[in-house]
């Protein structure tokens, strides 16, 4: 729906856990999944997409800076964090001792509450020049002479000469099907699978106070797989999201200190790049996430110490944890029954590596939520 009619019943306090709405308002509508994110804006070409495949770094940075001016026009902050400071470089040197690589970036944190307000301001301006049609399902795309025809669920057909399709990650599988039908070759054989880590904010405070979000990459010794931290949220909250009926986990943080928690959360993701003949990474990721749902009815949570010992976390064991979960609807269980052994081994090794630069990361009561899955939109 439009930016004003998107309301998650969990956030509104009407229910305690996901009720599987037919359309997830957290993920779909004006602003997409970003509408309720905490608005991290990264100034870098080291990660965040593939634009550098088509233009040089200077051009990409010029576009990133342009988008920042648009964001500020609609209310974004001018405050930034950077890895290009003496304190950040000291963190980078310390991380390298343990084969952890800190990616270079300048970052702005808008905050969940401010991000929504900025998008509302954009929506008001765009309404003056664009006609929107919300809650209108496009069933199919067909060629129509030199243009295209869209078949809507209501039975209507819309014809156009030029068509821009941007269904986001929630519509990635649908988009792949449409491209296959149209004979358009796609590039996408990657999915990232992992967990969301939650621990006391003080454990990472010496890092988040300097760079806010640390993007750290580690190559595991056991398998040689790449594991990375992603979407770090100091004093944040862990949340569930619904991707086509599958509950996955995510996180966010507010700018307002009054809305903060005592914990920091971040994702640990293992990159999975598949080779021929396998070409269904999206379905693979959904299947992994569905195993967590099958075991817990939603998002699963486990203490790190229990995972290492091979013990299932239950309500009693979770109640003993000094780290209190911010996602109270998460169900205690055993991640080893849901995630593949290889990815789980990678995650455990990464946690021990992080513990060397942020002592306390590998504490028994560090909480792991699963599954977190990052889907990649297909590219032409």
Name these PLM-found stretches.
Residues 55, 65-68, 73-74:
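Conserved catalytic/binding loops enriched for acidic/polar residues
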Residues 50, 61-64, 68, 276:
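Mobile "lid/hinge" segments at catalytic clefts and subdomain interfaces of large enzymes
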Residues 76-78:
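Compact, glycine/acidic-enriched structural inserts
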Residues 1-55, 81, 86-380:
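Residues forming the flavin
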């Amino acid at each position: 729906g439009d930016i004003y009619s998107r309301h998650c019943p969990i956030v509104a306090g009407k229910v305690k856990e996901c009720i599987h709405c037919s359309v997830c308002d957290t993920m779909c509508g004006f602003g997409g999944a970003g509408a309720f994110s905490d608005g991290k804006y990264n100034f870098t070409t080291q990660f965040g997409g593939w634009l550098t495949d088509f233009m040089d770094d200077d051009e990409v940075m010029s576009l990133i800076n342009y988008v920042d001016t648009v964001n500020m026009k609609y209310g974004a902050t001018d405050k930034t964090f950077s890895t290009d400071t003496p304190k950040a470089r000291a963190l980078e040197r310390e991380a390298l001792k343990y084969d952890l690589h800190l990616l270079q970036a300048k970052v702005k944190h808008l905050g969940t509450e401010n991000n929504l307000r900025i998008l509302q301001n954009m929506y008001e301006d765009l309404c003056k020049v664009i006609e929107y049609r919300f809650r209108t399902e496009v069933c199919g795309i067909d060629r129509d002479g030199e243009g295209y025809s869209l078949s809507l669920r209501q039975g209507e057909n819309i014809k156009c000469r030029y068509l821009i399709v941007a269904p986001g990650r929630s519509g990635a599988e649908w988009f792949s099907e449409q491209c296959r039908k149209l004979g358009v070759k796609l590039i996408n054989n990657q999915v990232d699978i992992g967990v969301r880590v939650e621990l006391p904010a003080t454990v990472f405070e010496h890092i988040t106070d300097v760079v806010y979000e640390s993007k750290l990459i580690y190559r595991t010794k056991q398998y040689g797989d790449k594991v990375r931290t992603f979407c770090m949220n100091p004093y944040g909250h862990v949340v569930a999201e619904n991707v086509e009926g599958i509950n996955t986990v995510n996180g966010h943080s507010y700018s307002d200190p009054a809305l903060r928690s005592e914990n920091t959360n971040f994702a640990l993701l293992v990159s999975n790049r598949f080779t021929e003949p396998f070409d269904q990474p999206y379905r693979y990721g959904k299947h992994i996430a569905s195993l967590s749902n099958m075991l817990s009815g939603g998002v699963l949570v486990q203490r790190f110490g229990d995972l290492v010992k091979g013990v299932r976390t239950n309500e009693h064991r979770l109640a003993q944890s000094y780290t209190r979960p911010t996602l109270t609807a998460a169900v205690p269980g055993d991640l080893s029954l849901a995630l593949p052994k290889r990815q789980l081994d990678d995650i455990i090794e990464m946690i021990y590596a992080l513990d060397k630069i942020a002592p306390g990361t590998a504490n028994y009561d560090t909480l792991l939520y699963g599954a977190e899955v990052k889907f990649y939109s297909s590219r032409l």
